[in-house]
Amino acid sequence: MRPVVSTGKAWCCTVLSAFGVVILSVIAHLFNTNHESFVGSINDPEDGPAVAHTVYLAALVYLVFFVFCGFQVYLARRKPSIELR
């Protein structure tokens, strides 16, 4: 199997996706626990767990991108490079 994207783009996507998964998971957890700073104001949503569910789904999308891009990095590293003699 051949990689779909270049190695540099795959690494960039992998790092950004990992960051997205971590940040969105933390935000979703804070909504799920009805943290004061996320649901305590007048303009904030009242149903924290419903918002947390949506944010967890967004983190899942980032996780899929993380797996895909990580697999692209694996494929690029596995491919033998050209050797000059």
Swiss-Prot record:
Per the record, the GO terms for biological process are: endosomal lumen acidification; Golgi lumen acidification; proton transmembrane transport; vacuolar acidification
Q: How does it sit in the membrane?
A: Multi-pass membrane protein
Q: Name one GO cellular component term.
A: Golgi membrane
The keyword Phosphoprotein is assigned to this record: no
Q: Which UniProt keywords apply?
A: Endoplasmic reticulum, Membrane, Transmembrane, Transmembrane helix, Vacuole
Residue numbers on the Lumenal membrane side? 1-10, 76-85
What subcellular compartments does it reside in? Answer: Endoplasmic reticulum membrane; Vacuole membrane
Q: Does the keyword Transmembrane helix apply?
A: yes
Molecular function, one GO term = RNA endonuclease activity
- Transmembrane segment boundaries: 11-31, 55-75
Top-level taxon of the source organism: Eukaryota
- Quick one: where is this thing mainly located? endoplasmic reticulum
> Coiled coil located at which positions?
none
Q: Which residues lie on this side of the membrane: Cytoplasmic?
A: 32-54
The task this protein performs is described as:
Accessory component of the V0 complex of vacuolar(H+)-ATPase (V-ATPase), a multisubunit enzyme composed of a peripheral complex (V1) that hydrolyzes ATP and a membrane integral complex (V0) that translocates protons. V-ATPase is responsible for acidifying and maintaining the pH of intracellular compartments.
- What is its quaternary makeup? V-ATPase is a heteromultimeric enzyme composed of a peripheral catalytic V1 complex (components A to H) attached to an integral membrane V0 proton pore complex (components: a, c, c', c'', d, e, f and VOA1).
Indicate what this protein is called per its UniProt record. Answer: V-type proton ATPase subunit f
| Native species | Saccharomyces cerevisiae (strain ATCC 204508 / S288c) (Baker's yeast)
- Identify the taxonomic lineage of the organism of origin: Eukaryota, Fungi, Dikarya, Ascomycota, Saccharomycotina
